From Swiss-Prot:
ATP binds at residues 12-19. Residues 37-40, 161-165 are annotated as: Interaction with substrate tRNA. Substrate binds at residues 14-19. The keyword DNA-binding does not apply. The record marks 103, 125 as: Interaction with substrate tRNA. Keywords: ATP-binding, Magnesium, Nucleotide-binding, Transferase, tRNA processing. This is tRNA dimethylallyltransferase. Its cofactor is Mg(2+). SUPFAM superfamilies: P-loop containing nucleoside triphosphate hydrolases.
């Protein structure tokens, strides 16, 4: 018997069928679901995130869905803390945590831990905010591009919270956020080589996707069209009508939402919005595949196979998760 309690990771690109398989697994295994998705944490963002239906959530509850207002931010560190607490509760009941989603950074943070970043510094933050008021957020973004080009490439100039944090880390520690993360990766690699691990669970890693990438692209396009038919534009209009949300927030920068927001701002026609939304979703899937290709001990399932449940159960049995 394993010394550590079991957990299951069910990963994959967007539109691959992760939720359906996860629900099927809960019907035959003592599993409880934890969502691993940076967009599903937000309330009022249902259609564009392909959130499980209210019926599905009532019958098969998912933790870490609908836990935040769209005006709030949610970090990988927040996720790790919340997920560890949920996993402990599930394990204490004698059940298996089944973590399902496509935010690969969250899976990685949970598995390997996070770099020890310096604490917030009120004086440094005040100076950065004063600089932003005087010179604009683009000027701060230009500063970040000099000291941490990797972070600058992923942080939008209109995302003040993340922009300030990245510059704050550099000014307080003298190291970029990217350097801190690289240091953590090296430490995690060393820990794995020595048999130590950050996550106190025996994890079985499952991934699901269509074997043919063209099929996934077709599914992405169809799902985006269905979202529009289901009222995606009205959903974003409701968010805009609040008056306290803007395109720089992490929630509104989620794939699909930023394109619809730009359309409602008059920056894109409806056809352009739909095309760019589909392209952005395909790019997201490509990034997810990049993460998954480097994942150790990963068992793949084909989205189009009719026997994925039995295949998943066979694999879980083979790695002693079910013993």
């Amino acid at each position: 018997m394993n010394a550590l309690p079991p957990a299951i990771f069910l990963m994959g690109p967007t539109a691959a069928g992760k939720t359906d398989l996860a629900i099927e697994l809960t019907k035959v295994l003592p599993c409880e679901l934890i969502s691993v998705d940076s967009a599903l944490v937000y309330r009022g963002m249902d259609i564009g995130t392909a959130k499980p239906s209210k019926t599905q959530l009532a019958e098969h509850p998912h933790r870490l869905i609908d836990i935040l207002d769209p005006a709030q931010s949610y970090s990988a560190a927040d996720f790790r803390s919340d997920a560890l607490a949920a996993m402990a509760e599930i394990t204490a009941r004698g059940n298996i945590p089944l973590l399902v989603g496509g935010t690969m950074l969250y899976f990685k943070a949970l598995l390997d831990g996070l770099a020890d970043m310096p604490a917030a510094d009120a004086q440094v933050r005040a100076q950065l905010e004063a600089d932003a008021q005087a010179f604009g957020w683009q000027a701060l973004h230009d500063q970040l591009a000099v000291v941490d080009p990797v972070s600058a490439a992923r942080i939008h100039p209109n995302d003040p919270q993340r922009l300030i944090r990245a510059l704050e880390v550099y000014r307080v520690s003298g190291m970029s956020m990217t350097a801190h993360r690289e240091q953590q990766t090296a430490q995690s690699t060393e820990a794995a080589a020595s048999g130590r691990q950050q996550l106190p669970y025996t994890v079985a890693n499952l991934a699901i996707a269509p074997a043919d990438r063209k099929v996934l692209h077709q599914r992405i396009a169809l799902r985006f069209e269905q979202m529009l038919d289901q009222g995606f534009l009205d959903e974003v209009l409701a968010l805009r009508s609040r008056g306290d949300l803007h395109s720089g927030l992490p929630s509104i920068r989620a794939v699909g939402y930023r394109q619809v927001w730009d359309h409602l701002d008059g920056k894109l026609t409806r056809d352009e919005m739909q095309e760019r939304g589909i392209i952005a979703t395909r790019q997201l899937a490509k990034r997810q595949f990049t993460w998954l290709r480097s994942w150790d001990d990963l068992h793949w399932l084909d989205s189009l196979a009719s026997d994925n449940l039995s295949r998943a159960l066979k694999y879980l049995g083979s790695v002693s998760i079910l013993s």
